[in-house]
Regions:
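Active-site-proximal alpha-helical scaffold in enzymes
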Residues: 105-135, 181-211, 264-270, 357-378, ...
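Condensing-enzyme catalytic core mediating Claisen C-C bond formation in acyl metabolism
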Residues: 19-49, 182, 234-297, 302, ...
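Active-site pocket-lining segment
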Residues: 178, 284-353
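Conserved catalytic cysteine-centered active-site region
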Residues: 76-127, 167-172, 233-256, 337-365, ...
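N-terminal extracellular/periplasmic Venus flytrap/periplasmic-binding protein-like
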Residues: 34, 46-55, 63, 190-274, ...
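Active-site pocket-shaping loop/turn-to-helix segments
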Residues: 34-61, 78-79, 101-115, 127, ...
Length: 402
C-alpha cells in the first residue's frame, strides 16, 4: 500500500481534511543544520551550551537567509534556567527585537520546540520561526537545594533532576530502562542486535557522507564522536551491567551523554513565496502523550501509536520512522509494535551510536528523517522521542518534491 500522499490530488481530496488542525496545511520546513555530536568532556568540553547553540543557529540563519525570524524556540534539558534560549540567541547576534524562549521537556525538548513553532505558524501568530535545541552535558551547571532551608539541610548537589514524586536518584533513567526490559521480557540478544545495527548504519553514513548536507561544522569538530565502526558482539559480551543488581543495561545499549545543537527553519506558505525559499517538507501534525514515569522508554512508541491513530494512518503508510533510541529497549518495543517497519527505521543509525544531547535530539532526528525520506524518495515520515518523567512526543511530516 502506498502512502496516502503518493496518490496525488485525489488522495488529498479524500484525506486532506484529517490533516487540518487550524491551518497546519500552511506550515513548511525549509531546512536545517546540526552540529557534529560530541561525547561528554570530549571535543566540546570547553564550549558552553549557549555558544554551541549559537554557532549552529548563525549558520542556519545564513544558509536559509532568515536574518530576523519571528521567534527562536529552543529546547534545553540540563541548563540552569534563566531562559537560556534567549541567551543563546543573543550570543548568535540575533536582533534583540526577536523573542526567544526555552522549551524543557527533557529528551523531547527539541521535537516539542518544532511542534510549538508549527502551531504558532498554523494559528497565524508567526510567519517564520527557527526551532530546535542545544545541549552541553560537558558544561552542565551543578544544581542543589538551598542549604539554608531547614527542609533541605544536608542535601547534596545533584546533576539529574527529579522526575517523579518521592524518587531522586542519579540512576533513575537507567532503572527505568532496566524495568522496561523486565516488564517486556526483552532478551540481551535483542538489545545487542539493535546496538550493532545502530553503529553499523551510523558508521556507514559517516563513511559515505550521507548526512554532510545537514552538518554545521563548529569549534574544530570533524565527525560525530560517539560512533564505533568496530562495535562487535565480542565487545558487547564483555561489558558489565551498569546497575548493581541489573540484568540488562550496559554502556552500549544505553545512549552516551552528549553535547550538540540542531535547528530547523519553519515558515508559512506566504513567507515561503515572498522570500523565494524552497520547502523540503510540510508539517502535518504532532502529538504528545503521557505514560508510566518508571518506564518512560515506552512512551516513544505510545506517541507514535497516538499520532497514527489521530491521522487515520497505519505503519504501511509511513516511509520512514526516526526514533531517538536513548535505550535499545526502545528499538525492541518499536519492532514488536510495528513489525513491518523495521527496514524503514532509523535509516542512518540512532542515538546508541550518535549519542543523545537531550535538548537537541528531537531536531537532530527530524533532520535525519528529512534525509532518509529524500534518499528513499518517500512521502510521509514520523519522528518520536521518549522523555524523562514518562512523556512521549511525535511529529508527522510530508516530504515536498523539489
Amino acid at each position: 500500500m502506498l502512502p496516502v500522499f503518493a496518490y496525488g490530488l485525489a488522495a488529498r481530496r479524500k484525506y486532506g481534511d484529517i490533516f487540518k488542525v487550524g491551518n497546519m496545511d500552511n506550515v513548511y520546513l525549509v531546512g536545517g543544520l546540526r552540529s557534529y555530536v560530541g561525547v561528554v568532556n570530549g571535543m566540546y568540553r570547553h564550549v558552553p551550551a549557549e555558544k554551541l547553540g549559537a554557532a549552529v543557529l548563525k549558520q542556519v540563519m545564513a544558509k536559509y537567509a532568515v536574518p530576523k525570524p519571528d521567534y527562536i524556540i529552543a529546547g534545553n534539558g540540563v541548563g540552569a534556567g534563566g531562559n537560556i534560549a534567549r541567551l543563546m540567541a543573543l550570543e548568535a547576534g540575533v536582533d534583540t527585537a526577536v523573542p526567544a524562549f526555552t522549551i524543557d521537556v527533557q529528551c523531547g525538548s527539541g521535537l516539542e520546540s518544532i511542534a510549538v513553532a508549527a502551531a504558532k505558524i498554523a494559528c497565524g501568530e508567526a510567519e517564520c520561526i527557527i526551532a530546535g535545541g542545544f545541549e552541553s552535558s560537558s558544561t552542565q551547571p551543578r544544581r542543589g537545594y538551598n542549604p539554608n532551608h531547614p527542609d533541605y539541610a544536608g542535601e547534596s548537589w545533584y546533576s539529574v533532576a527529579k522526575f517523579m514524586p518521592g524518587i531522586h536518584r542519579e540512576t533513575v533513567m537507567l532503572e527505568g530502562a532496566e524495568l522496561a526490559c523486565q516488564r517486556e521480557a526483552v532478551s540481551k540478544a535483542e538489545l545487542d542486535e539493535w546496538v550493532l545495527r545502530s553503529h553499523r548504519l551510523a558508521a556507514q553514513a559517516q563513511q559515505e557522507g550521507s548526512l554532510r548536507d545537514i552538518i554545521a561544522p563548529c569549534f574544530g569538530a570533524s565527525k560525530d564522536e560517539g560512533i564505533r565502526p568496530r562495535m562487535s558482539q565480542r565487545l558487547l559480551d564483555r561489558l558489565p551491567k551498569v546497575l548493581e543488581n541489573g540484568e540488562f543495561i550496559t554502556a552500549a545499549n544505553s545512549c552516551l551523554i552528549n553535547d550538540g545543537a540542531a535547528f530547523v527553519v519553519l515558515c508559512s506558505a506566504s513567507y515561503l513565496k515572498e522570500h523565494g525559499l524552497t520547502a523540503q517538507a510540510k508539517i502535518l501534525g504532532s502529538v504528545a502523550c503521557g505514560g508510566d514515569p518508571l518506564v518512560s522508554p515506552r512512551t516513544a512508541v505510545t506517541a507514535l501509536e497516538k499520532l497514527l491513530a489521530k491521522y487515520h494512518l497505519t505503519e504501511v503508510d509511513i516511509d520512514d520512522f526516526e526514533i531517538n533510541e536513548a535505550f535499545a529497549v526502545i528499538d525492541v518495543l518499536f519492532a514488536r509494535t510495528f513489525p513491518q517497519s523495521v527496514a524503514k527505521y532509523n535509516a542512518f543509525g540512532g542515538a546508541l551510536a550518535y549519542g543523545h544531547p537531550y535538548g537537541a535530539s528531537g531536531a537532530i532526528i527530524t533532520l535525519h528523517l528529512l534525509e532518509a525520506l529524500k534518499r528513499c524518495r518517500g512521502h510521509l515520515g514520523c519522528a518520536s522521542v521518549a522523555a524523562a518523567g514518562g512523556i512521549g512526543t511525535a511529529l508527522l511530516l510530508e516530504r515536498v518534491e523539489a
